[in-house]
UniProtKB/Swiss-Prot annotation:
Gene3D superfamilies with a match to the protein in the record: Cytochrome P450
Family: Belongs to the cytochrome P450 family.
Protein's membrane topology: Single-pass membrane protein
Name assigned to this protein: Fusicoccadiene 8-ol C-16 hydroxylase
Gene responsible for this protein: bsc7
Originating species: Alternaria brassicicola
Transmembrane is among the record's keywords: yes
EC number assigned by the record: 1.-.-.-
Function: Cytochrome P450 monooxygenase; part of the gene cluster that mediates the biosynthesis of the diterpene glucoside brassicicene C. In the first step of the brassicicene C biosynthesis, the bifunctional diterpene synthase bsc8 that possesses both prenyl transferase and terpene cyclase activity, converts isopentenyl diphosphate and dimethylallyl diphosphate into geranylgeranyl diphosphate (GGDP) that is further converted into fusicocca-2,10(14)-diene, the first precursor for brassicicene C.
Main location: membrane
Gene Ontology MF annotations: heme binding; iron ion binding; monooxygenase activity; oxidoreductase activity, acting on paired donors, with incorporation or reduction of molecular oxygen
Stretches that traverse the bilayer: 12-32
Residues carrying sugar: 249, 317
C-alpha cells in the first residue's frame, strides 16, 4: 500500500514538474508575445510580476525595465507595459467601432464591487458607464464648480486656521491633506461637514480609503492563482473587510439622509443628480451609493497625494518655493483675492502643479486593458488578442526618452518658450487618463489644489523638517503611493 502511494505521489510530482517546465518553455519561446522583450522571469511566469506587485515594487521595476528594454516591455506572459505618448490614445482613447475598444481587465477590477453588491462606474460595462457618467457629469461642469468654490474655500480657510494654531510646530502634512481632502469631497457629496480636520488622530474613514486600496491590490494579485476567484474574494471580504463595510454603510446612511431632503437647489453632488429626470438615465439608489462611495475614495486619496507631493517637492527646491511664494504675496495683497479665476491666470502656479503631477503622479500604476478578439494596433505594433496592456504612468513620466532631466523637479519645463525642454514629450503626461473613462473630477481636483496650495503659501513659510528628504524616494506602491508621514513646519509668514 505504501509503495503504491509513493509511486502515485512520484508520478503526480513528475507530472507537475513536466507541466511547469512545459509552460515555462511555451511562455518564453512559443507564446504569441514571445518576441517582445522583458525580464526572463516575467516572461516565464506570472508569479514573478504578482510578487513584484504584492511587495510594492511594481512601478520602480517598470521604470527599470522600460529603461532597459524600451517603450514596450513584456512584464508577464500575457501582459505588456507601454510608456510612450501614442500608446495612451491607442489603449485608452475612444474608438468609433465597439469591436475595436479595449475593455478593462475584468480580473483587476473584480474588487470594484461595493458591499451592497453594486458595481461602481469604474467597473461596469460601456453602456452603463456612459449612462452613470452622464448623470454624474452634471455635478462637475464649470457652472457647478463656480458654485462650489465658496464651499472649497471655506474648507481651505479652516485648514489654514488649524495650521496657524500649531504656531509653526512640526506636523505630518500627509494626515492633514488626507483629512482636508476628505472633508471637501464628503461635503460636496452629502452636503454635510464631517470635520475630519478636527480629529487629533487619523480620521478612520480617511485612513480606510488608502489602506483598503493597498490591501485590495495585493489580494487581487493573489487571486490570480486561485480557483473560484469570485467566491474566494467574497469570503475574504466578508471575513476581513469590516472597516470597509462600516465605511460604506456610513456613506449609505449619509446619502439616504440627503436623499430624504429631496432638495435640488444646493451645490452638493446629490442635488445635481436629483435634477436628472430622464427615466432612462436615473440612477437607482444602490447605484447612487456605490458611485458616491467611489467619488469619495478616488477624490480624497488622489487629491491628498497631489498636495502632499507638491508641498514636498516645493520644500526641497527652495528657489522655486521662494519664487512662487513671493509671486503669490506680491500679486494678491489680501487673502480674499485668492480666487479660482485669479489663480488660473498664474502661470508659475500651474507649472508647479503640472510638474508635481509628473514627478509624483497620484496614480503611478497601470490601468490594465484587454485587447479585443481582433487584436489591437498599439504604438505602431499589432498586439495579439486577449493581451493585457497598459501605460505605466511612473515609468512614462520618469523616462529620459520622454523628459529631459526626468528625475528633477523643474516646473519651467512646462513653459512653451523654454528651449531646454523643447523635445520633452508632453503628450505623454496624462495624470487624469483620457477618453470616455478619464477622470470625471479633473477640474475639481485642479481647483482644490490651486486654492489649497496658494492659500498655504500665502499664509505660511513652509519648511521641510530635517531627515524628510527621502520621503518619496523610499515609497512603495500598491496602485497608489504608500505614503509615510511627512513632517513639515508651517510658520506664520515673515513678510
Amino acid at each position: 500500500m505504501a509503495s503504491i502511494l509513493w509511486t502515485t505521489s512520484l508520478k503526480v510530482l513528475l507530472a507537475l514538474i513536466v507541466w511547469i517546465g512545459t509552460t515555462i518553455i511555451y511562455n518564453i519561446y512559443f507564446h504569441p508575445l514571445h518576441s517582445f522583450p522583458g525580464p526572463v522571469l516575467a516572461r516565464a511566469t506570472r508569479l514573478y510580476s504578482a510578487y513584484i506587485r504584492a511587495v510594492g515594487l511594481s512601478e520602480r521595476k517598470s521604470l527599470q525595465w522600460h529603461n532597459q528594454y524600451g517603450g514596450i516591455v513584456r512584464i508577464a506572459p500575457d501582459e505588456l507595459s507601454f510608456n510612450t505618448g501614442s500608446a495612451w490614445n491607442d489603449i485608452y482613447g475612444t474608438k468609433s467601432r465597439k469591436s475595436q475598444r479595449l475593455q478593462k481587465d475584468p480580473h483587476f477590477y473584480m474588487g470594484a464591487t461595493a458591499p451592497n453588491g453594486e458595481k461602481n462606474m469604474g467597473a461596469v460595462g460601456d453602456e452603463d458607464h456612459s449612462r452613470i457618467r452622464s448623470v454624474l457629469a452634471h455635478a462637475f461642469t464649470d457652472t457647478a464648480l463656480h458654485a462650489q468654490e465658496s464651499l472649497i474655500r471655506a474648507h481651505v480657510d479652516r485648514l489654514v486656521q488649524r495650521l496657524q494654531d500649531l504656531h509653526g510646530k512640526p506636523t505630518d502634512i500627509v494626515r492633514w491633506m488626507h483629512h482636508h481632502s476628505y472633508d471637501v469631497i464628503a461635503h460636496l457629496c452629502f452636503g454635510q461637514d464631517l470635520d475630519a480636520l478636527g480629529s487629533k488622530d487619523w480620521f478612520p474613514p480617511a485612513r480606510v480609503v488608502f489602506e483598503g486600496i493597498r490591501e485590495g491590490v495585493t489580494l487581487i494579485e493573489v487571486l490570480r492563482f486561485v480557483p473560484f476567484k469570485a467566491t474566494v474574494l467574497d469570503i475574504l471580504v466578508q471575513a476581513f473587510g469590516k472597516a470597509r463595510r462600516e465605511n460604506f454603510n456610513a456613506s449609505v446612511a449619509r446619502a439616504m439622509l440627503r436623499l430624504r431632503l429631496a432638495e435640488t437647489t444646493s451645490i452638493d453632488f446629490i442635488s445635481y443628480i436629483l435634477r436628472v429626470k430622464e427615466s432612462a438615465k436615473e440612477l437607482t439608489r444602490s447605484e447612487l451609493t456605490a458611485n458616491v462611495a467611489l467619488l469619495i475614495d478616488a477624490g480624497s486619496e488622489t487629491t491628498a497625494t497631489m498636495l502632499s507631493g507638491c508641498l514636498f517637492y516645493l520644500s526641497l527646491n527652495r528657489t522655486t518655493l521662494e519664487e512662487l511664494t513671493h509671486k503669490l504675496r506680491e500679486d494678491f495683497r489680501t487673502h480674499d483675492q485668492l480666487s479660482l479665476q485669479n489663480l488660473a491666470k498664474m502661470k508659475l502656479l500651474t507649472y508647479v502643479i503640472q510638474e508635481s503631477l509628473r514627478i509624483y503622479p497620484p496614480l503611478p500604476a497601470t490601468l490594465p486593458r484587454l485587447t479585443p478578439a481582433t487584436g489591437a494596433m498599439i504604438n505602431g505594433v499589432l498586439i495579439p488578442p486577449k493581451t493585457r496592456v497598459g501605460m505605466n504612468a511612473f515609468a512614462a513620466y520618469h523616462s529620459t526618452q520622454n523628459f529631459a532631466d526626468a528625475d528633477m523637479f523643474i516646473p519651467q519645463r512646462w513653459d512653451n518658450t523654454n528651449d531646454r525642454f523643447a523635445r520633452d514629450q508632453r503628450h505623454v503626461h496624462r495624470p487624469f487618463s483620457l477618453g470616455s473613462r478619464g477622470c470625471l473630477g479633473k477640474n475639481l481636483a485642479w481647483a482644490e489644489i490651486r486654492l489649497t496650495l496658494a492659500c498655504l503659501l500665502w499664509n505660511f513659510d513652509v519648511i521641510l523638517e530635517p531627515g524628510q528628504e527621502e520621503w518619496h524616494g523610499k515609497q512603495l506602491t500598491w496602485f497608489i503611493w504608500n505614503k509615510d508621514p511627512l513632517y513639515m513646519r508651517f510658520a506664520p509668514r515673515t513678510k
